């Protein structure tokens, strides 16, 4: 967005927090940020306000703006169908229009009096229907003949702290059985040292050829890999759009998990399973996310090529379902609101 000329009033990194307990140390800062943003927008009201995801931050802001006559659009519906049922009433008060990225959401929202439009998922248009593994490997410098396992332990410090040690110990287990495996790990510059420390703690010395880190190359790594071990979140959808069999894992502080599981409305956590409405890929959550179990599940995909091919076909169907002209559909919906106002 910055590259397109948008002005950043605060760096995105200050909003990069997920969970319940994890947000507490940042709560005062986040609330102050939202108050300052509301004051600024109310002092100079925009023609329309679009909140992008982040419902815990954006919905109260949208309510305040809408009460002052500012038309509001919310892009990416809260996951009320998974564990945010309580958000529907606030969403009704907050948004003149919700732009949904999943096809089943508009009907559910409209049944609760929330205007909603399906616009497709932006990632489905960004990612090629037939990813080129050979080209990705050439770009990353990975051998075309090796079996590559992608490790994606998350994009936040808390996720890395909880998952990277488990993922690298799982990699160590896998190497014990398949010494020729190679592991590709996308990371961000700000998280590289933390990821490297987790790798070293699992016994991977700096420069170990079995593990390679790639900064800002998550899509390249997913295109290049044979199978992925992925932290629950948007990265699981990305892996599905790249048609890669995967194992989903997540671990969070005990209290956050207790709160979340009491709100959980479906048996699945990973987006591919939620969208397919069945366990098409295995999930290992909390104490089930043990390194040996993760390793066994990843190797199982490599040992079952027919099952891997079947799940890739499911992911191809999913890709077509989510692939729409999102930018045009979203802009059309916003234009209608502007004309109406």
For the regions a language model picked out, list residue spans one by one.
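Nucleotide-activated sugar donor-binding and catalytic core shared by glycosyltransferases
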Residues: 1-341
